[in-house]
Amino acid sequence: MLNTIELAKELIKFKSTPHNLEEIHNVTKFVLDYVQKHSKTALQTKILEKNGYPTLIIATQSVKKPALTFYAHLDVVPAKNNDFTPVVKDNKLYGRGSGDMKGPAASLINAFITLVNSNPNYDICLFLPTDEESGGHNCCKHAIETFGFRTKCVIMPD
């Protein structure tokens, strides 16, 4: 498993801006593959999609009604191309999304994997929409209203 800074650097490289659906799908696939590779247990996965925007849901038991949800969005606001080249300077990570929200997403993804690998006796979920920067109408709203997603507790460092 990558350390959190290295994972954040990998996420920052994706130009997952609104309307760049190819990169949005690429970062979603990257995260799914990463979690599956590093989890020691079988997980339930669901990818919801509306208007081309995916929401990745990965859970230990229920992708629809988990007890604890880690939430982070994988999209970022538009930027210059060089902003997608992560740089660590003076022990700080720079790059598009390092603070909102690919840095925090990397923390939650690694925390989720670590918790999953400790065999918790409750259901936990990783909920990753891709349209937060453009209003959230295609992912969260769709997950709640159409899919029926509900959770008891959310950790969201945004």
Locate the predicted segments by residue.
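Acidic/His- and Gly-rich active-site-bordering loop/insert found
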Residues: M1-R96, N117-N121
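Acidic/histidine-rich catalytic neighborhood of metal-dependent amide-processing enzymes
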Residues: K102, A106-D158
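Loop-rich non-cytosolic ectodomains and luminal regions
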Residues: G99
